[in-house]
UniProtKB/Swiss-Prot annotation:
Record InterPro entries: PEP_COase (IPR021135), PEP_COase_bac/pln-type (IPR022805), PEP_COase_Lys_AS (IPR018129), PEPCASE_His_AS (IPR033129), Pyrv/PenolPyrv_kinase-like_dom (IPR015813)
Enzyme active site: H149, K585
Protein name: Phosphoenolpyruvate carboxylase
EC number: 4.1.1.31
Cofactor: Mg(2+)
Native source species: Nocardia farcinica (strain IFM 10152)
Any one GO molecular function term: magnesium ion binding
Catalytic reaction annotation: oxaloacetate + phosphate = phosphoenolpyruvate + hydrogencarbonate
Length: 923
C-alpha cells in the first residue's frame, strides 16, 4: 500500500502560476496584435529586466535607464500594460485564495479563526451563562458603513470587466471537456481585448450621484442576499446554544452609508442629494421585494383542493385578483398578488420613478411601513407550516422575510455628518436672527452650554417662514429638514445618526442638537415630558488631543440635564466615533493607535460610571496609515468592554470592492465582523489580566516617544511640507477624479489641513508608506535602551496582547510594501539638495531602525514571516511595481521641468492607478 502523497507548497501554488501565465499570455497577445511588435517588445524587455532586478542580477537603476527619455506615445501603452498585468494577477490571486479555502474545507481542517464556525467552537468551550449572554447581546449591532472616501481608483467599467473575466476563469477551472475549455478561453480573450480597449482612468470627476449609485450597486451584487442569510444563520446558531435567552430580537447585521449624507468638506451634498440618496436606496429594496414576490408566486402554486390555508391567508387571497376566477383555487398566488399590489402602491408613493416590477390597481392601499408588509409574509409562512409545508416556507419566502426584517423600506441607514466649525457658524447666525444672542461665537464655553440647553427646552423655533439667512446657514437647515422628510417617509432607521466631526466640546454636541430641533428631528418635549430625538448625536474625536479629552467631553455632556434626557430617551445608548486617519496624520502610527486605545478605555469607564450603553464607531480607512488591516484582528485588539455586542465601522474605497463585490468574499468578511464582535464581547480576549495597568503605562511611554519622533520630522523640520509636495505625486492625486470631494479642506500648505487620503496615497505611491510606521522604531529603540529585560517585556506583550501584536503585524504589512531604493528616486525630484538629504536621511534611518526593532521583538528576521502567502504575493508584484514607479518618477520629472502636455499628465495618472492596483490599496 503506497503512502498518500503530501502536497508541497509548489503543488499548492501551481494553479496560481498557471493562471497568471495564461492571463499574461492573453494580454501579451492582445498588446502585440493591437499596439504592434515594437511596443510589445519594449514591454517584454522591461518586464524581463524587472524580474532580473528582483533576482538581484542587475542594479536598481536598470529599469530606470531603459525608460529614461522614452517617447510618451510608447510610455502610455507600457504603463497600461503593467497596470493590466497586475490587475489580472490580482484576479488570479483571488481565485487561488478561494481554491485553497475549498481544499482546506474538503480536507476537514479546523475552521479559520475569523469564521463563525471557529467562534462557535470557542463559545461552546467557554460554557457561558445564558443570562449574561442575553445582557451583553441585548443591543447587538454590527454595522459596516459604506463611505464615499475616494480611494477606489478603478472605474466601474474596468471593475465590471474584471468581474466577468473572474467568472470565466472560474468556469475554465471547472471545465473538463477540452472543447468547453477552448470556448471559455476564447471568451476570456475577447474580454481582455475589451479591457485593453477601455480607458483606465476617468475623464471627469465622479458626481455624488455617481457615488450613491456605486455604493448601492454592492447590494445588487452581494449584500442584499448575503446579509439577511448571515443574520438568520447567526440568530439560529446562538438561540440553539442558549434556548432560554431570546437572543438577537433584531438582526445583528444592519448596514449603513455616508454617501449623500456626509457633507464635511463636500459642498456637493445638498438637501436634494439627501433625499435622492434615501430614495435611491429605498428603490433598491422595493424593486427587489417586488421581483421576489413574482418569483415566489411561481413556486407557491398550492391548490385549495389539496391544501388548507389559515383564515388570514384566505382573507389575503380574497383581496387578490379582481377576477375571482384568476388562480381561483390557488390561494397563495392570490394572496401574493394582493401583497404585490399593496407594495406597488407603496413604491408609487415613496419613490420618484416608476418600478418595472410594480402592478398598479386603483384604490390600492400602500403599506404604512415594513412591519405591515412583513406581517403579511409571516401570515403566509405560518399557513404553510400549519399545513405541514414548512419546507416551502424555508426557501424564497424565508429569504424574503429575513431581507425585509433587515432592510425595511430604507435598505440602509444614511448617516449625516458635518464639521463642528460649520455648526458653530450656523447656530450663531440662527441665534442672532431670532434675537436670542447677537454674538454667540464670543461666548465662553459654559455660557454657550447654558444658552443651548435652554433653547433645547423650548418649542419655539428660531426661524420663521421669512427668515433671511446666509447661503451656508440656509443650506444646512435645508439639509436637516430634508433628513426629517426622509425619516417621515421611510422611518427613523433611514437616518439613524448625526456625526459631529472635529468635536472638541459639549457645545459642539449641543449645537448639532439645536440644528436637529430646528429641522424637526428633535422634540423638546415641552411643556410636558422629556426631550427625545430620532437621530443619535455622535461626537467624532479625531486628533490625538481630542481623543485624549473625548471621555471628559462625553462625561461633561451627560451632566447637562437636557442632553442626559436625550440619551435616556434613546435607551441610555450613546454612540461615539473615533477617527483613525486624522489622529495618525497628527501624531504618527504608534501614537495614534495608542491614543485610540486609551480613548476607548476612558470612554468605557465613563459609560460604567454614568450607566450608559456605549457604542463605538470606528472610522477606519483601507490602509494601515488610516486604521486599516484585518477587521477581525482589529476587533479583538479592542480593550475589554469596548465592544459589548455593538460595533460600527466604515468601509471605504478600494476596500469595499475587495470585500463585497463577490458573494463568497462578502460572506467571509461579514462573518469575520460578527465573529470578532461575539468573541470580543463574550470572551476574555485581551489576555493581560493583572498585567494590564503596567502594560498601559508602558504604552503611554512608547506613544509619547513615538509622537515626539514623528513630530520632529513632520511638524518641526523646516521645509518638510515642501519636501512632501516635491517628492510625491500629492499634487496630482486631486486630478485622479476618484471622488466628488476636494483633496483639501481649505487651500493651504499645512499638513493638518490636507485630507488624510491624499496624504497617505502620496506616500504610498512613492513607496515610503510613512504614515504606517514612522516614529515607531525610534520609540521602541529609545524605550528599550539596550536593556535585554525591557526587550523581553515587549516580546512578552507581542505574544500575549492582541493590541500590541496587531500594531506590529500591520506595521510589518505596510513596511513590506515600502521600497526605499524606489523612494530615493522620488527624493531626487526635490530641488533643494540639502533639504532632500536631510529629510530622506531621517526617513531612511528610521526605516532601518523600525525594521531592527520589529525583528528583535517578534523574533522574525523577515517581515511577514508569519504570513507567507501575503509575503509571497508582495514579492511576486515586484516586477509590475518597478516599471510603474520608475515611469512615474520619469514623468513627474518631465512635468516639473515644464512639459505639461496632456499626455504626460495622463501618463502620471495612469501610473497612479496602476500602483494603487498593484499595492491593493491606495489611500
Amino acid at each position: 500500500m503506497t503512502e498518500p502523497r503530501i502536497e508541497t507548497e509548489q503543488d499548492a501554488t501551481r494553479p496560481l502560476r498557471d493562471d497568471i501565465r495564461f492571463l499574461g499570455g492573453v494580454l501579451g497577445d492582445t498588446i502585440r496584435d493591437h499596439e504592434g511588435p515594437e511596443v510589445f517588445d519594449l514591454i517584454e524587455r522591461v518586464r524581463i529586466e524587472a524580474f532580473r532586478v528582483r533576482r538581484e542580477e542587475v542594479g536598481r537603476s536598470a529599469v530606470a535607464e531603459m525608460l529614461r527619455g522614452v517617447d510618451i506615445a510608447v510610455a502610455l501603452p507600457l504603463i497600461r500594460a503593467f497596470s493590466y498585468f497586475v490587475l489580472l494577477a490580482n484576479l488570479a490571486e483571488d481565485i487561488q485564495r478561494d481554491r485553497r479555502r475549498a481544499v482546506h474545507v474538503a480536507a476537514g481542517e479546523p475552521p479559520q479563526d475569523s469564521s463563525l464556525a471557529a467562534t462557535y467552537r470557542k463559545l461552546d468551550a467557554a460554557a457561558l451563562d445564558a443570562a449574561a449572554v442575553a445582557d451583553l447581546l441585548s443591543d447587538a449591532l454590527v454595522s459596516p458603513v459604506i463611505t464615499a472616501h475616494p480611494t477606489e481608483t478603478r472605474r466601474r467599467t474596468v471593475f465590471d470587466a474584471q468581474t466577468r473575466i473572474t467568472e470565466l476563469m472560474r468556469a475554465r477551472q471547472r471545465a473538463t471537456d477540452p472543447a468547453e475549455r477552448a470556448a471559455l478561453e476564447s471568451r476570456i480573450r475577447r474580454q481582455v481585448l475589451s479591457l485593453w480597449r477601455t480607458a483606465l482612468i476617468r475623464l471627469a470627476r465622479l458626481r455624488i450621484q455617481d457615488e450613491i449609485a456605486v455604493g448601492l450597486r454592492y447590494y445588487e451584487l452581494t449584500l442584499f442576499d448575503v446579509i439577511p442569510a448571515i443574520n438568520a444563520e447567526v440568530r439560529a446558531a446562538l438561540r440553539a446554544r442558549w434556548p432560554g435567552a431570546d437572543l438577537l430580537a433584531r438582526p445583528i447585521l444592519r448596514p449603513g452609508s455616508w454617501i449623500g449624507g456626509d457633507r464635511d468638506g463636500n459642498p456637493y451634498v445638498t438637501a436634494e442629494v439627501v433625499r435622492h440618496a434615501a430614495t435611491q436606496a429605498a428603490g433598491v429594496a422595493l424593486r427587489r421585494y417586488l421581483a421576489e414576490l413574482v418569483e415566489l408566486a411561481k413556486t407557491l402554486s398550492l391548490s385549495a383542493r389539496l391544501v388548507p390555508v389559515t383564515p388570514r391567508v384566505a382573507e389575503l387571497a380574497a383581496a387578490g385578483y379582481p377576477d375571482p376566477a384568476t388562480h381561483g383555487d390557488e390561494p397563495y398566488r392570490r394572496a401574493l398578488h394582493h401583497i404585490r399590489v399593496r407594495l406597488s402602491a407603496t413604491a408609487d408613493r415613496v419613490l420618484d420613478a416608476p418600478v418595472p416590477e410594480a402592478v398598479a390597481e386603483p384604490d390600492a392601499q400602500p403599506y404604512a411601513g415594513p412591519r405591515e408588509f412583513l406581517d403579511d409574509l409571516d401570515a403566509i409562512d405560518a399557513s404553510l407550516r400549519a399545513s405541514g409545508d414548512g419546507l416551502l416556507a424555508d426557501d424564497r419566502l424565508a429569504a424574503l422575510r429575513h431581507a425585509v426584517e433587515t432592510f425595511g423600506f430604507h435598505l440602509q441607514g444614511l448617516d449625516m455628518r458635518q464639521n463642528s466649525e460649520v455648526h458653530e457658524q450656523v447656530v450663531a447666525e440662527l441665534l442672532a436672527w431670532a434675537g436670542v444672542h447677537p454674538a454667540y461665537g464670543d461666548l465662553p464655553e459654559d455660557a454657550r452650554v447654558e444658552l443651548l440647553a435652554a433653547e433645547l427646552r423650548t418649542r419655539r423655533p428660531l426661524l420663521g417662514p421669512h427668515a433671511r439667512l446666509s447661503e451656508q446657514a440656509a443650506k444646512e437647515v435645508g439639509i436637516v429638514r430634508a433628513a426629517k422628510q426622509v425619516v417621515d417617509t421611510f422611518g427613523p432607521e433611514a437616518v439613524p445618526n448625526y456625526i459631529i466631526s472635529m468635536c472638541t466640546s459639549v457645545s459642539d454636541m449641543l449645537e448639532a442638537a439645536l440644528l436637529l430641533k430646528e429641522g424637526g428631528l428633535l422634540d423638546p418635549g415641552a411643556p410636558e415630558g422629556s426631550p427625545s430625538c430620532t437621530v443619535n448625536i455622535v461626537p467624532l474625536f479625531e486628533t490625538i488631543e481630542d481623543l485624549g479629552a473625548g471621555a471628559a467631553t462625553l462625561a461633561a455632556a451627560l451632566e447637562v440635564p437636557v442632553y442626559r434626557e436625550l440619551v435616556a430617551a434613546a435607551g441610555m445608548r450613546q454612540e461615539v466615533m473615533l477617527g483613525y486617519s486624522d489622529s495618525n496624520k497628527d501624531g504618527g502610527y504608534l501614537a495614534a493607535n495608542w491614543a485610540l486605545y486609551r480613548a476607548e478605555l476612558d470612554l468605557v469607564e465613563v459609560a460604567r460610571k454614568t450607566g450608559i450603553r456605549l457604542r463605538l464607531f470606528h472610522g477606519r480607512g483601507g490602509t494601515v496609515g488610516r486604521g486599516g488591516g484585518r477587521s477581525y484582528d482589529a476587533i479583538l485588539a479592542q480593550p475589554a468592554g469596548a465592544v459589548r455586542g455593538a460595533l460600527r465601522l466604515t468601509e471605504q474605497g478600494e476596500v469595499i470592492a475587495a470585500k463585497y463585490a463577490e458573494p463568497g468574499a462578502a460572506h467571509r468578511n461579514l462573518e469575520s465582523l460578527i465573529a470578532g464582535t461575539l468573541e470580543s464581547t463574550l470572551l476574555d480576549v485581551e489576555g493581560l489580566g493583572a498585567d494590564a495597568e503596567p502594560a498601559y503605562e508602558l504604552m503611554d511611554e512608547l506613544a509619547a516617544l513615538a509622537r515626539a519622533a514623528y513630530a520632529r520630522l513632520v511638524h518641526e523640520t523646516p521645509g518638510f511640507v515642501e519636501y512632501f509636495r516635491q517628492s510625491t505625486p500629492v499634487a496630482e492625486v486631486g486630478d485622479l477624479n476618484i471622488g466628488s470631494r476636494p483633496a483639501s479642506r481649505k487651500p493651504t500648505n499645512s499638513v493638518s489641513d490636507l485630507r488624510a487620503i491624499p496624504w497617505v496615497m502620496a506616500w504610498s505611491q512613492a513607496r515610503v508608506m510613512l504614515p504606517g510606521w514612522y516614529g515607531t522604531g525610534a520609540a521602541l529603540e529609545e524605550w528599550v535602551g539596550g536593556d535585554p529585560g525591557r526587550l523581553a517585556r515587549l516580546t512578552d506583550l507581542y505574544r500575549r496582547w492582541p493590541f500590541f501584536r496587531t500594531v506590529l503585524s500591520n506595521l510589518a504589512q505596510v513596511m513590506a510594501k515600502s521600497d526605499l531604493d524606489i523612494a530615493a528616486r522620488y527624493a531626487e525630484l526635490v530641488d533643494d539638495a540639502a533639504l532632500r538629504d536631510q529629510i530622506f536621511g531621517m526617513i531612511r534611518e528610521e526605516h532601518a531602525r523600525t525594521l531592527r526593532m520589529h525583528a528583535a521583538i517578534t523574533g522574525h528576521d523577515q517581515l511577514l514571516a508569519d504570513n507567507r502567502s501575503l509575503a509571497e504575493s508582495i514579492h511576486n508584484r515586484f516586477p509590475y511595481l518597478e516599471p510603474l514607479n520608475q515611469m512615474q518618477v520619469e514623468l513627474l520629472r518631465r512635468l516639473r521641468s515644464g512639459d505639461d502636455s496632456e499626455l504626460v499628465k495622463r501618463g502620471i495618472l495612469l501610473t497612479m492607478n496602476g500602483l494603487a492596483t498593484a499595492l491593493r490599496n491606495s489611500g
